[in-house]
């Protein structure tokens, strides 16, 4: 009896198997889709730690399970086909270059941890590709699962917004994070999953197509409410690309009516979404609530070039690193360490960006330009595979259907990677693995068994005569020399069995090593969270030994790039164990451009009374971080002790030129100048401060006080005599000295004011009024002087004018004026 032939795999990949799906494979696909999302924080400082650990454990489980499968055991192509595909090969070469760049690493522990993350996502893509090649229906399963989760994400967002509005509050979009670590990851998770809904809409039928349309609509609505500009642009590009795809697709079928229907539906859905969003902003959001995330779509678009200074500065510093290290970079995971060489001189504090906010640039910075090109080629090859299949003459839907999802998926991921750092976010990294796994699985043909008939459809990556195509010329030439090299390598024969065994053992060893590394990192992250929460209290409360003994060997810098030794030092400082702190700090070389260890070393030496050593390390900090004002204060404190005022004043003057809009430099500098006897310099410094900060009350106040002191200084002894006589109530003597002083310095308003009081107490009201007039002419009026003029006027019989002055004095807060106003001005 003749067996019914099973349908051969097409150019898009695996065979279509008619039997039911294998539960274990289905479970693994669903697990890869959701494992990073559902893994809890476990009270760590960075939820990425436990999520990467969970993904690594899933990789080990998957690999072990796949090795035991009979249908895979005797087929080397099941495990090695990934590496003969140009996408998989580009990814593998990226891993190899990442390993090579270890030789450039400043901090090898960070490189090990970072490589473990890269390898974990790579393995996830590898496992997904093997499973998807068994049966394309697993892709549908993954698409449905992730579309359902996309709907859950969207409705979680809508629920939080609705709850806030019902309570009469603003939506507080920034605080909404669902099961993710923050708002930005939620926004990315929504956007990067949209291609799954697009795929269901484009290629499924009936209920699944309707579900795809519904999911696409709510995802678009959620993207609007998240108010993320990068994803606004991404949504526009994705929708335009989809409409172009639909247009060409139905044009070739002569189904213009269908094209119009689909296009109208998509555009109408977007228009309705924008309308609902705008109406919510206008009618439901509280009128008195306003933030970055509660402005209209087009208003938000207008700010797309604003607020990007931090990203732009970060990218600029990254390009400097790339220029210095174009071949192998600064080492994987070392961007946050190496970039401080350029970030420190412009940062006034220790709040650093520990990510580039652009994975393409960060990869080039850390592992070289070629690595970044290989990363880009993953996206390019996936897109070209789809375009080649789609534009092929007489192309059937079956030839490009399965390539649509990875192409559009990587397009969405690319937007996130260009503006953020999804490579370090396992929730998004797992989606990348799904897309890359699908791209590899469905762009490679199975090699026929010996003696069997070859497939009648050539694999898209093999070198065959190029048929007439509608692909534009430039697209057909994109796979250049690099593509040809990868294609050549992809034709290397599969490994012999004797090589497969050691490779399998090696792969398992790396998987186990990654898990061990993530466990150690997990333990460190738990302590990092405790330390961070303790630091936010008024005083450190946790026991020092918990951190001194508890932190593992690595990582030796925190998730925020702070050397771990600094965290330990804070507790030793609290316990006044400065010698122990010095021993730890001096032995640390985890981050050579981070000056926190040197800052604490200087402080430890100071606390031990070793001021010269303290000054040496303070100057080391200053050399790298000239805008860190606390360090300048410490330097000036020691210089002042050594009576080296000119040196200290020069430091402060330099600081005020570099940070002209910071009041602390002007105020501290003025006090320092005053202490050193340089009043003229103090006033000059405050004049400069008033120029940049004209409304700063403290600068104006200090300038006024120092101006008085500068006028008094040449005749200080005489002025002090006048004041002392006034205090002793010897008003005649005080008038004598004040008059003598005024003859020498006629421009000191305070001298006229005090002499006016003396004349009043001597009952010489007219002379008192004359001096008060001078005070008012100089603009020195205050509550006290209004009250003084009032009592003079009362004594001179002008109660109407006196009451006006008493009332003004009360308004200005003069307490002595209150009884005068009550007694002489209120009607009985």
PLM feature spans:
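Flexible juxtamembrane loops connecting transmembrane helices in multi-pass membrane enzymes
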Residues: 175-176, 238-239, 259, 274-317, ...
């Amino acid at each position: 009896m003749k067996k019914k032939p099973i349908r051969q795999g097409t150019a898009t990949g695996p065979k279509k198997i008619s039997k039911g799906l294998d539960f274990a494979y289905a479970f693994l696909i669903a697990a890869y889709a959701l494992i990073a999302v559902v893994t809890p924080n476990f009270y760590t400082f960075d939820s990425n730690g436990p999520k990467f650990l969970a993904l690594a454990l899933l990789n080990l489980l998957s690999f072990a399970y796949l090795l035991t499968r009979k249908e895979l055991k005797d087929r080397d192509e099941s495990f090695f086909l990934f590496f003969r595909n140009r996408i998989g090969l580009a990814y593998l070469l990226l891993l190899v270059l990442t390993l090579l760049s270890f030789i450039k690493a400043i901090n090898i522990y960070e490189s090990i941890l970072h490589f473990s993350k890269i390898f974990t996502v790579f393995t996830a893509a590898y496992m997904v590709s093997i499973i998807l090649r068994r049966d394309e229906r697993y892709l549908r399963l993954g698409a449905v699962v992730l579309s359902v989760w996309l709907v859950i994400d969207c409705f979680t967002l809508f629920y939080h917004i609705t709850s806030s509005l019902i309570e009469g509050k603003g939506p507080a979009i920034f605080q909404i994070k669902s099961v993710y670590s923050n708002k930005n990851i939620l926004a990315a998770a929504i956007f990067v999953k949209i291609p799954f809904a697009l795929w269901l809409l484009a290629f499924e039928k009936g209920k699944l197509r309707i579900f795809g349309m519904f999911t696409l609509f709510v995802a678009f609505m959620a993207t609007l409410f998240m108010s993320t500009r990068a994803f606004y642009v991404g949504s526009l590009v994705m929708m335009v690309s989809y409409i172009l795809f639909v247009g060409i697709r139905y044009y070739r079928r002569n189904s213009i009516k269908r094209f119009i229907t689909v296009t109208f539906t998509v555009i109408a859905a977007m228009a309705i979404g924008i309308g609902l969003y705008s109406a919510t902003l206008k009618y439901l959001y509280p009128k008195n609530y306003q933030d970055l995330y509660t402005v209209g779509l087009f208003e938000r678009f207008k700010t797309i070039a604003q607020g990007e200074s931090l990203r732009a500065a970060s990218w600029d510093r990254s390009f400097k690193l790339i220029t210095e290290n174009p071949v192998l970079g600064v080492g994987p995971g070392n961007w946050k360490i190496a970039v401080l060489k350029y970030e420190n001189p412009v940062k006034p504090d220790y709040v650093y960006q520990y990510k580039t906010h652009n994975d393409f640039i960060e990869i080039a910075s850390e592992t070289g330009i070629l690595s970044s090109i290989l990363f880009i080629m993953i996206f390019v090859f996936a897109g070209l595979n789809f375009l080649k299949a789609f534009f092929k003459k007489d192309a059937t839907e079956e030839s490009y259907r399965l390539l649509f999802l990875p192409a559009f998926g990587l397009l969405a991921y690319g937007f996130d990677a260009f503006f953020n750092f999804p490579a370090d976010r396992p929730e998004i990294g797992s989606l990348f693995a799904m897309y890359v796994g699908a791209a590899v699985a469905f762009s490679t043909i199975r090699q026929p068994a010996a003696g069997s008939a070859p497939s009648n459809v050539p694999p898209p990556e093999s070198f065959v005569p190029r048929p007439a195509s509608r692909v534009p010329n430039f697209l057909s030439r994109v796979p250049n020399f690099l593509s040809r090299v990868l294609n050549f390598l992809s034709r290397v024969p599969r490994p012999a069995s004797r090589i497969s065994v050691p490779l399998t053992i090696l792969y398992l060893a790396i998987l186990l090593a990654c898990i061990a590394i993530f466990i150690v990192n997990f333990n460190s992250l738990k302590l990092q969270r405790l330390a961070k929460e303790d630091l936010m209290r008024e005083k450190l409360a946790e026991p020092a030994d918990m951190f001194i003994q508890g932190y593992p060997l690595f990582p030796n810098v925190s998730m925020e790039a702070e050397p771990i030794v600094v965290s330990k030092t804070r507790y030793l400082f609290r316990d006044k164990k400065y010698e122990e702190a010095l021993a730890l700090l001096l032995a640390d070389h985890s981050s050579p451009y981070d000056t926190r260890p040197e800052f604490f070393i200087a402080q430890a030496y100071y606390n031990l009374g070793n001021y010269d050593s303290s000054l040496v390390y303070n100057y080391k900090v200053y050399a790298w971080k000239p805008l860190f004002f606390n360090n300048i204060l410490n330097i000036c404190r020691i210089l002042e002790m050594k009576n080296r005022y000119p040196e200290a004043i020069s430091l402060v003057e330099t600081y005020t030129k570099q940070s002209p809009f910071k009041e602390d430099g002007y105020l501290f500098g003025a006090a320092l100048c005053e202490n050193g006897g340089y009043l003229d310099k103090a006033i000059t410094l405050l004049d400069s401060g008033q120029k940049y900060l004209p409304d700063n009350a403290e600068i104006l106040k200090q300038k006024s006080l120092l101006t008085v002191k500068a006028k008094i200084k040449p005749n200080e002894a005489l002025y002090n005599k006048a004041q002392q006589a006034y205090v002793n109530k010897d008003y005649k003597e005080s008038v004598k000295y004040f008059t003598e002083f005024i003859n020498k310095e006629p421009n000191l308003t305070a001298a006229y004011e005090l002499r006016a009081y003396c004349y009043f107490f001597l009952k010489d009201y007219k002379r008192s009024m004359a001096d008060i007039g001078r005070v008012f002419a100089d603009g020195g009026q205050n509550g006290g002087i209004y009250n003084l003029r009032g009592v003079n006027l009362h004594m001179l019989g002008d109660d109407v004018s006196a009451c006006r002055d008493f009332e003004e004095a009360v308004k200005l807060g003069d307490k002595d004026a209150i009884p005068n106003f009550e007694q002489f001005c209120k009607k009985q």
